[in-house]
Each structure stands twice: as structure tokens, then as C-alpha cells.
């Protein structure tokens, strides 16, 4: 029964993979990744300014203003900045389809998108200048609009050579200025015209109009059905081999960051912060220890199973999973594509967000009002993100207990199967391992498990003799770090001239030319055809990995070195 259900879900995989590679969704995601230092930096000052309130201490107004200035001057302009970073990412995607001698200037598109955004989101101040009310999270949807219009117009002009052409004698940097003049002017005229139409028709700026238009959707998304569908999709997509965040995160990005600011404003006013859909909810409630709410799973594998293999996988997975990097348990067990774990893998995140919503609406716990790094351990993220209240400790403990209850019966069934294999009563399920390997890049997890003695593969010496720089890419940089670390450790141990670095897909365009090989982790393997256009143009080798394969490579440094060598032999 479960096998048939999974097979039906997998039939939609090609469509959802195509959706995850959509250049506009990717531009939104990568635009936020580029702006993440601003978002995280600003949250530090929120914590300093308002966490002491929990313990009865309040800064005086002057000191509060000093502490809040870094927040207001960074997060308060985040939409303005994201307009530029989103335009840059989208420009990179369009440039892949253009001739290398006729590319769109991403610096120009960034400037045009940011200038255009000001027309759409700012109002004139009485004493000159302009107001910034919609330049923060309230203006994110408008930032996307400005970025998309900008790059589409630039692409139209550059592709058709609608530019001012200068004599060959003119230096390239001067010639580029005139080449950008027509598309830049067209963007500003179009967005200014839109601004005039909206202001005269609805007596508001475009950003305010868009916010009012989508307000019912934001409200509905925060309801029981909304959070169930949105956060259930994360785990469902991941289970069948699709990187769910690539689809879901861009669609809800504006809601999550707007809700964070709304919650903060409510707390400032002494009211209850009740917005559910936030980045903190996603990272510390729904993906509590990684997609599938797997924080408890490695501990359960260690302490609640009888199989030697399961115990070893649990021990190897505990530390990375505690910090939100759960590939070792996802692909090492495996949990993904494993019919036994389908129900708990999808159900646990949904139940977690239901419990959180009950705590917010019934018990009065404040929802998340600050952005924290995704590698913050789940329980600590809950406590810090919700203001260190007593109920936050209770919530963290409750989620741990509930997730154990959800996973326990399925773990016992799976452990029984593995025990039968170990004792020779049942043949090893190589089909499942091969299926995971075919759908996920498991190198990172393999490396971790190998280092812990889980892998049976013998290592072989590497024949790499020339300096080789390797870039490992995953969705956010955490998973890729496992393989990069395994490569660097093995290279040092065996004196092989390999240097590896980890990165997030989308933030790689400006650095990829420094590497001879790029390896895609399973999370981003579906982007292989897109990035291959870039690597072929630059003469860089490209390799993608699958789930079980990636885990194996992260366990075994020598195997990872062999994998690198094989890419240059093929």
C-alpha cells in the first residue's frame, strides 16, 4: 500500500523538479541567501535590545534607540537590498542563454532594480527625501516585481541589440555605460509609469497596494490548513527526492519575513506576537533537526535499536543532525524513499507546527520575532527565537517527546527488518539503497558515516598529482561542508594536492571560475543541466551525486579523492 502511494507521488517528480529549477523562484531564493548576512546581523541587535525585557530589565529610550539603529538601517532596508540581489541572480540565469560576447551587465540590473524599487515603494517626505515605511519586509513582493521587470527588459534589449553602440576605439568600460543606458532608462520609465498609474488610481504606492492585495492570502496561509499544506510540502517533496525548500521557500518568503517584523512590532507594543509562518517556525519547529523533524531520530537509532548497523548510523549522525545537517541519517538509514518511514517523515513536521500553533494561540507563547542562523540547534532556536519564555522550554521538550512517539513504532519495524538481514533471515534490501543513490546526492552523509566506521568499503590511494580545487555545492552550504571537509582531511592525510570548499547553490557564480571541479550534492542535483552550461563555458568539470553515494563519500575520504580523480579520467 505504502509502496503504491510513494510510486504515485513519484510520478509528479519531473514536474516538481522543473518547478524547483524555475529561474524566478530560484532568483528569489538566491536573492535572500545573498542578503542573509544583513538579516542575521540585524537580529543580533534585536536580541540585545529586547531579550533583557524578559528578565525585568529595560534599556532607557536613548540606549534603546542606539541599539535599534543598526537594525533599522539594515533590516529596515532589506527589500531595497533584495531587489538588487534578486535581479543579480535572475541576470545570471538569463545570461546562460545569451552568447558569451553579449551578456547582461548584472551590476547595471542591480542598480536599475533598486532605483525602480524606490519609485514603487517610497513616498516623498514633507521636508525632502522619501519615507522608508515599505523599504523593509513590507516591500519584499514589490522588490521581486522590480527585479523581474528589470531583468526582463534588459534581456529584451540586449538580446536584440537595442543599445547605443560606440566605436571600437572607445574603452570597454565606457562603452558598457552607453550599452546599459537604453535598458536602464526603459526600466525606470516603465516602473515610474506604473507608480503614477497606481497612485492616481488607488491613492497609494505600489508596495502598499500589493500588500493589501495579498493580505487575505497571508492571513489564510497562517491558518490551520495553510500551515499544514505549506510545511507538509517540505517533507513530502524531500521524501521523493525533490529539494522542497527550492519550491516552497520562494513562495512564502515574503510572508515569513513580513511576519517576523509584524511579530517584533507587536512585542514592541506590548502585545502578543501571534504570526505563525516565520523563518524560525520553518527552521526550528518544522525542520526540527532537519527536514522530517529528525532531531530525535539519531538518538533513537543509538538507544532504541538492536541492529549494529542502525546503532552505528545513529552515532555517526547525532552531531550533524543536532545542528540541522541531517543527510547522514536521511541517506544512511535511509529515511527518504523508505516506505517504512514515509508516515513519520511527513507527519512529524505537521504535528510539530500544530503543537506550536496551539502553544501560540492557547497558551500565549510568543511566536518567532528574530531571525537566527539555521544551524542553531533546534531546542536553542526555539528558546531564543520566542524570547526565552518559560513556555518555550516546555515547547522544546514537548516536540522532542512527540517526535519520539511518532517515529518509535516505525523505527521498531525497520530495526526488525535490518536485524533479519544481519542475522541472515532476510536478504539485504539493495533495491532501496540503489533507489536512494539514484535520487539523492549522499556523498556528504557517506563521508560522515565512513569516518565513524559504518562503511565497509576499503580506501584506495589517489593518483592525483596536480593542484585541484573542488567546489561542493548544496542548498545552503551545510551539507556540502561534510564532503568538502572529508576531501580536505583525506588530502592532508595522504598528501594529495586537493583543496575543497563548500558553498550554496546560487551563490557560486562569482567564484566557480577558481575551481577545476564542481560537485553537486543530492539537494541540488536537479540543477545539473543549468549549471553545466556555465561549467562547459568555463572549462570546469561538473559531477552530480546521489543520496547513498554522497553519504559514502562523506564517510570515506579516500573514496572521495577517487571520485574526484574519476571525474578527470572520464
Swiss-Prot record:
GO terms for biological process: carbohydrate derivative transport; phosphoenolpyruvate-dependent sugar phosphotransferase system. The chain crosses the membrane at residues 31-51, 65-85, 104-124, 133-153, 178-198, 223-243, 283-303, 340-360, 382-402. PROSITE patterns: PTS_EIIB_TYPE_3, PTS_EIIC_TYPE_3. This is PTS system lactose-specific EIICB component. InterPro entries: LacE, PTS_EIIB-like_sf, PTS_EIIB_2/3, PTS_EIIB_3, PTS_EIIC, PTS_EIIC_3, PTS_IIB, PTS_Sugar-EIIC/EIIB. NCBIfam families: lac_pts_IIC (TIGR00394), lacE (TIGR00410), pts-lac (TIGR00853). Its main location: membrane. It is found in: Cell membrane. The gene is lacE. The phosphoenolpyruvate-dependent sugar phosphotransferase system (sugar PTS), a major carbohydrate active transport system, catalyzes the phosphorylation of incoming sugar substrates concomitantly with their translocation across the cell membrane. The enzyme II LacEF PTS system is involved in lactose transport. The modification Phosphocysteine is found at residue 474. Residues 467-570 form the PTS EIIB type-3 domain. GO terms for molecular function: kinase activity; protein-N(PI)-phosphohistidine-lactose phosphotransferase system transporter activity. It is a multi-pass membrane protein. It catalyses: lactose(out) + N(pros)-phospho-L-histidyl-[protein] = lactose 6-phosphate(in) + L-histidyl-[protein]. It is an enzyme of class 2 (transferase). The active site is at 474 (phosphocysteine intermediate). Induction: Induced by lactose, galactose and galactose-6-P. Repressed by glucose. Residues 9-410 form the PTS EIIC type-3 domain. SUPFAM superfamilies: PTS system IIB component-like. GO terms for cellular component: plasma membrane. Keywords: Cell membrane, Kinase, Membrane, Phosphoprotein, Phosphotransferase system, Sugar transport, Transferase, Transmembrane, Transmembrane helix, Transport. The EIIC type-3 domain forms the PTS system translocation channel and contains the specific substrate-binding site.
